[in-house]
Amino acid sequence: MNNMTAIVPAAGVGSRMQADRPKQYLTLLDKTVLEHTVEHLLEHPLIEHVVVAVSADDPYFANLPLAHHPRVIRVDGGKERADSVLSALEYVCQHRLSEWVLVHDAARPCVTHADITQLITTALAHPIGAILASPVRDTMKRGDHLQQIVHTVDRTALWHALTPQMFRAQSLRERLFAALQQQVTITDEASAFEWRGEKPALVAGRADNLKITQPEDLALAEFYLSRNKEKS
């Protein structure tokens, strides 16, 4: 069980950050966001390799010390997240790196090892796989095209999907490929299974496993990382 592979799709542009480079290459404390994310995955005792999918013309990755790490593998990503994940899966399956993969957002540097371990334990015992998720706590409203409230949505069964998301590499590869062939919109790995009527497990994860999408998220991620370092 100690040879899991993590996949990090990192070919996105992240235009909402309004920065001069993709958000995964913005500086967070003393490193890039991507370095924090990948190094954190590598430090988990059950993860052997991390496959990073970046744009073919990415000018940043090769300049990171991370690019030369013996357990980090670079592959070309695609236009959409699903394309990048599929490219990484092709490598994992071709080289038989591991039976299972954990797909994790490049812009989520704050995931805890405890959450990763709980995800792995749950996924291995489930027939399909599992994802980290956080129960919705806020009151949810459905709006119309004028941004007016239509009604309040029952939040009882609603979850925020987080990452990592863990599935068997071959199963995820087959489902992603089939969905893309049918032009099905795939927003995360679990949705490739949902499309087939399959139900991955939900693993309650920490809400501080935030995804950096807005400029203010950098400051919050810095706080979480600094706090976690003090605790360790």
Swiss-Prot record:
Pathway: Isoprenoid biosynthesis; isopentenyl diphosphate biosynthesis via DXP pathway; isopentenyl diphosphate from 1-deoxy-D-xylulose 5-phosphate: step 2/6. The lineage of its organism: Bacteria, Pseudomonadati, Pseudomonadota, Gammaproteobacteria, Vibrionales. HAMAP family: IspD (MF_00108). Belongs to the IspD/TarI cytidylyltransferase family. IspD subfamily. The keyword Transferase applies. It catalyses: 2-C-methyl-D-erythritol 4-phosphate + CTP + H(+) = 4-CDP-2-C-methyl-D-erythritol + diphosphate. This is 2-C-methyl-D-erythritol 4-phosphate cytidylyltransferase. The record marks R16, K23 as: Transition state stabilizer. InterPro entries: IspD, IspD/TarI, IspD/TarI_cytidylyltransf_bact, ISPD_synthase_CS, Nucleotide-diphossugar_trans. Its EC number is 2.7.7.60. GO terms for biological process: isopentenyl diphosphate biosynthetic process, methylerythritol 4-phosphate pathway. GO terms for molecular function: 2-C-methyl-D-erythritol 4-phosphate cytidylyltransferase activity. The record marks R155, K211 as: Positions MEP for the nucleophilic attack. Disulfide bonds: none annotated. Catalyzes the formation of 4-diphosphocytidyl-2-C-methyl-D-erythritol from CTP and 2-C-methyl-D-erythritol 4-phosphate (MEP). Keywords: Isoprene biosynthesis, Nucleotidyltransferase, Transferase.
